[in-house]
């Protein structure tokens, strides 16, 4: 693969492509600010330096770049055989995904897959570990097939059922509603579910921004633009990952709806 195929962040190009008519009216200082908060230069240097690393090796390079360390609890709860669905809270939006994939990837010899936004497929090193999903646009009709392919594979599945990273509500930092997909698909594929708790939090600025946008009725996820900045704020830290006991897929019977079972598992995660 040549260097030409390497994905690099280019804020100017993104703005020209996504907003061609408005681009010439965007002040240069705004473009410079966006480059700063997404850490364009630093991340591009890393992507270039790690361009030959794939899969779990790429995640390890990410861990080193972020100087992230992980303390693992409940390692005895990780099954040696069988296929499972690992579901975790999503406090950070960066280190949590990287660290969880790294820990499980090393434990299961690289046989792990994330269900992720298809935009992350642009990261060449991460792509081999991803099942791309897109609920909007032309690919929306293929969403069920994409999810099905992941669960029918011989890889361990890693999911963040909230989709978005945690928000602060009534003073408590916690995931928003967990989607029921992991319950339905785990039953169909007869995969037990392993609850995972990842310790960590973003800055007060991030939570305040998300809440202000919500209060103003702004639908665009502005807080998402700051996730790279939050990732850099969380460098040089040690995070605790706790694995709970596997929950047999037969547990998820008709006594609750899939959405209620998803909430049930979420509650278990926050008690770990």
Curated annotation (Swiss-Prot):
It catalyses: a lyso-glycine lipid + a fatty acyl-[ACP] = a glycine lipid + holo-[ACP]; N-[(3R)-3-hydroxyhexadecanoyl]-glycine + hexadecanoyl-[ACP] = N-[(3R)-3-(hexadecanoyloxy)hexadecanoyl]-glycine + holo-[ACP]. Pathway: Lipid metabolism. The keyword Zinc does not apply. GO terms for molecular function: acyltransferase activity. InterPro entries: ACT14924-like_Acyltransf_dom. Pfam families: Acyltransf_2 (PF19576). Keywords: Acyltransferase, Lipid biosynthesis, Lipid metabolism, Transferase. GO terms for biological process: lipid metabolic process. Transmembrane segments: none annotated. Its EC number is 2.3.1.-. The keyword Cytoplasm does not apply. Induction: Is constitutively expressed. Belongs to the O-acyltransferase GlsA family. Is involved in the production of glycine lipids (GL), which are phosphorus-free membrane lipids important for fitness during growth of the human gut bacterium B.thetaiotaomicron in vivo and in vitro. Catalyzes the second step of GL biosynthesis, i.e. the O-acylation of the hydroxyl group of lyso-glycine lipids, resulting in the production of the mature diacylated glycine lipids. This is Lyso-glycine lipid O-acyltransferase. It comes from Bacteroides thetaiotaomicron (strain ATCC 29148 / DSM 2079 / JCM 5827 / CCUG 10774 / NCTC 10582 / VPI-5482 / E50). The lineage of its organism: Bacteria, Pseudomonadati, Bacteroidota, Bacteroidia, Bacteroidales.
